[in-house]
Amino acid sequence: MKYCSSCGASVSHITPEGDNRPRYVCDACATIHYQNPRIIAGCIAEWQDKILLCRRAIEPRHGLWTLPAGFMENRETTLQGAMREAMEEANARVINTSLFCTFSIPHISQVYMMYRGELLQGYASP
């Protein structure tokens, strides 16, 4: 981060008074910019003992197989995000969902919340 999103001035990477770790702080307006982990919502969609996978169409890892998952949008629940990603990435409708697992990948600041459910009528498409 180089510039303040509040006023556009430059920022410094310092530990604010009363805090215990470095943050980006605006040199002009003193706004503290907190950078928090991103939440990834995804779905393990099952159909007749098979799992739905998607082939990645973009980087990173273009062409490799993955579960339908992605960044949450504002104003949606993690379940809504997981269902949206399944629909966007595989045109898949998933029912009877429940939270399957959560895990963190600290070095890239991501928290994953994966749901498990049934692929409706075994249908999905690119």
Predicted regions and their residues:
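Conserved Nudix-box catalytic region and its N-terminal flanking loop in Nudix hydrolases
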Residues: 46-88
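Short glycine/serine/proline-enriched coil/turn segments at secondary-structure junctions
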Residues: 35, 61, 106-108
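Conserved hydrophobic/aromatic beta-strand scaffold that supports enzyme active sites
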Residues: 3, 23, 44, 53, ...
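Unchanged
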Residues: 72-126
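Short edge beta-strand segments in beta-sheet-rich domains
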Residues: 21, 62, 110-112
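Acidic, metal-coordinating catalytic segment for phosphate/diphosphate chemistry
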Residues: 1-42
